[in-house]
């Protein structure tokens, strides 16, 4: 049985798209599915093995510390395919690919355009710089992935 591991550091454990549409569909198709996600316990729900991540303690925690937890917990599944859902996991996706794994990046939103509206990033020139750096890194990172799934054509 082929093992697939979905990874999210930002979405709720029973997200409609990730858990209900993608993970459960894979289970029904005969795959061994794990989901590394913020959750309170190890359990199997509708055939999906839930691998818990600790609750987020702010943006920096989620983007730096939680991504490390997610990467190492995902590795422990020893899956053949890794499907991640959050841009802060792009480096983990590159590392997984370097390790010979199949990697899918599921881009749910247009992050570079959202950066323009995130006041916590700084003033407008700083946001423009961050946006352009993100775009460059994203273009570099997707060269490593086997597949990129997007919800709209502009992504």
Model-inferred region functions:
Residues 68-75, 95-99, 105, 111, ...:
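Membrane-proximal helix-turn-helix segments that form the acceptor-binding/catalytic region
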Residues 13-15, 79, 105-124, 147:
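A short, histidine- and acid-enriched strand-loop-helix "catalytic/donor-clamping" loop
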Residues 73-90, 101-104:
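Short N-terminal targeting/anchoring amphipathic segment
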Residues 6-65, 154-155:
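N-terminal strand-loop element at the rim of the active site
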Residues 88, 153-154:
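Alpha-helix/helix-capping structural signal
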Residues 1-5:
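Extreme N-terminal starter segment of soluble prokaryotic enzymes
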Residues 49-53, 100, 121-125:
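Short, hinge-like loop/turn segments at secondary-structure boundaries
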């Amino acid at each position: 049985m082929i093992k697939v591991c979905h990874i999210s550091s930002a979405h709720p454990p029973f997200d409609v798209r990730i858990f209900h549409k993608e993970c459960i569909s894979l289970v029904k198709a005969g795959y061994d599915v794990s989901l590394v996600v913020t959750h309170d316990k190890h359990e199997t729900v509708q055939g999906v093995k839930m691998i818990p991540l600790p609750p987020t303690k702010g943006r920096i925690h989620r983007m730096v510390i939680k991504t490390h937890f997610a990467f190492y917990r995902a590795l422990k599944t020893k899956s053949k395919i890794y499907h991640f859902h959050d841009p802060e996991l792009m480096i983990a996706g590159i590392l997984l690919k370097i390790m010979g794994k199949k990697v899918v990046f599921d881009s749910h939103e247009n992050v570079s355009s959202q950066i323009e509206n995130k006041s916590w990033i700084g003033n407008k020139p700083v946001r423009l710089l961050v946006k352009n750096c993100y775009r460059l890194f994203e273009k570099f990172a997707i060269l490593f992935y086997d597949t990129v799934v997007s919800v709209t054509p502009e992504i």
